[in-house]
C-alpha cells in the first residue's frame, strides 16, 4: 500500500514525458515553427501544383483568330427555356442578360469592315408579322454580316421570300427550315458562295434532346474582315 504514492508519481512523470514527445513531434522540433501541425490540416490535393487552365481567347475560342479576322460565337436557344447568344470580338451582341433576345429568329447585323454592330433584333416567327423581318433584311448593304440564332420556333411564319433572302446571304438550310428546328447561321450580303458557318438540326420526336425540341447548337469561328476596297 505504501507503493501507491510513488507509483502515481512515476505514472505522472511518464505521462508528462509522453505528452512532451508528442507535442515535440507535432511542432517539428525547436525553431521549426508548426510545419507538422500545418501538414495535418493540408489536403493532399493542395500540395500538388494545379494544372494550368487552358487559355481562352475572344468569345471563348480555343485559338486566336488571324489578323484581319473577327472572332465569333453563336449559340441557339435551348427549347423555349434558355435564350440564344451572339458574341463578336468578345462583345455580347445579343443574350438574355442584355434582354434583347426573343422567340423566333435573333439577328445581329454587323459592319463587315469595322466589325461594329449596326442593329440587333428578335423576330417572333410563331405569332409575329413576317413583314417586320423582311423590312429588316431586304435593304442590307453589300458586305453586311448577318448573325442568326434560333430560339423556340424559327420558321412557322417564314414565306418563300424570307427563305430566298437568307439563301442569298449564303444559307444552305433556310429553304428547309421548319417548326422548332434549331438553326445558327452567319452570312453576308453579296456573297457568291454558300457560307461555311451554318448548323441546322431538325425537330424530330425520334432524335430530340428535349421534349418537343432538338438540341441547342453552338458555332464558333473566325470571319475575314471585308476590305474597304472590295
Curated annotation (Swiss-Prot):
Domain GG-type lectin: 68-226
Cellular location(s): Secreted
GO molecular function, one term: carbohydrate binding
Domain of life: Eukaryota
Signal peptide annotation: 1-33
GO CC entries: extracellular region
Listed PROSITE patterns: GG_LECTIN (PS52031)
InterPro entries reported for this sequence: FAM3 (IPR039220), ILEI/PANDER_dom (IPR039477), ILEI_FAM3C (IPR039475)
Lyase in keyword set: no
Disulfide bonds: 59-87, 65-222
Alphabetical UniProt keywords: Disulfide bond, Lectin, Secreted, Signal
Primary localization class, coarse: secreted
Family matches, as PANTHER family: UNCHARACTERIZED FAM3
Family, similarity comment: Belongs to the FAM3 family.
Protein name: Protein FAM3A
Organism this protein belongs to: Pongo abelii
Amino acid at each position: 500500500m505504501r507503493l501507491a504514492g510513488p507509483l502515481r508519481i512515476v505514472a505522472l512523470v511518464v505521462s508528462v514525458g509522453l505528452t512532451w514527445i508528442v507535442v515535440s513531434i507535432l511542432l517539428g522540433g525547436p525553431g521549426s515553427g508548426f510545419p507538422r501541425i500545418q501538414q495535418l490540416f493540408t489536403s493532399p490535393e493542395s500540395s500538388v501544383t494545379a494544372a494550368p487552365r487552358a487559355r481562352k481567347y475572344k468569345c471563348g475560342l480555343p485559338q486566336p483568330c488571324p489578323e484581319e479576322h473577327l472572332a465569333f460565337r453563336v449559340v441557339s436557344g435551348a427549347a423555349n427555356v434558355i435564350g440564344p447568344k451572339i458574341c463578336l470580338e468578345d462583345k455580347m451582341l445579343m443574350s438574355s442578360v442584355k434582354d434583347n433576345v426573343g422567340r423566333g429568329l435573333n439577328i445581329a447585323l454587323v459592319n463587315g469592315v469595322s466589325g461594329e454592330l449596326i442593329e440587333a433584333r428578335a423576330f417572333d416567327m410563331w405569332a409575329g408579322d413576317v413583314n417586320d423581318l423582311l423590312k429588316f433584311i431586304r435593304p442590307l448593304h453589300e458586305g453586311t454580316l448577318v448573325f442568326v440564332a434560333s430560339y423556340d420556333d424559327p420558321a412557322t411564319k417564314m414565306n418563300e421570300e424570307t427563305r430566298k433572302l437568307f439563301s442569298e446571304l449564303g444559307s444552305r438550310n433556310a429553304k428547309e427550315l421548319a417548326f422548332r428546328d434549331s438553326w445558327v447561321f452567319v452570312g453576308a450580303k453579296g456573297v457568291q458562295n454558300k457560307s461555311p458557318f451554318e448548323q441546322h438540326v431538325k425537330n424530330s420526336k425520334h432524335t430530340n434532346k428535349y421534349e418537343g425540341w432538338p438540341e441547342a447548337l453552338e458555332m464558333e469561328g473566325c470571319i475575314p474582315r471585308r476590305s474597304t476596297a472590295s
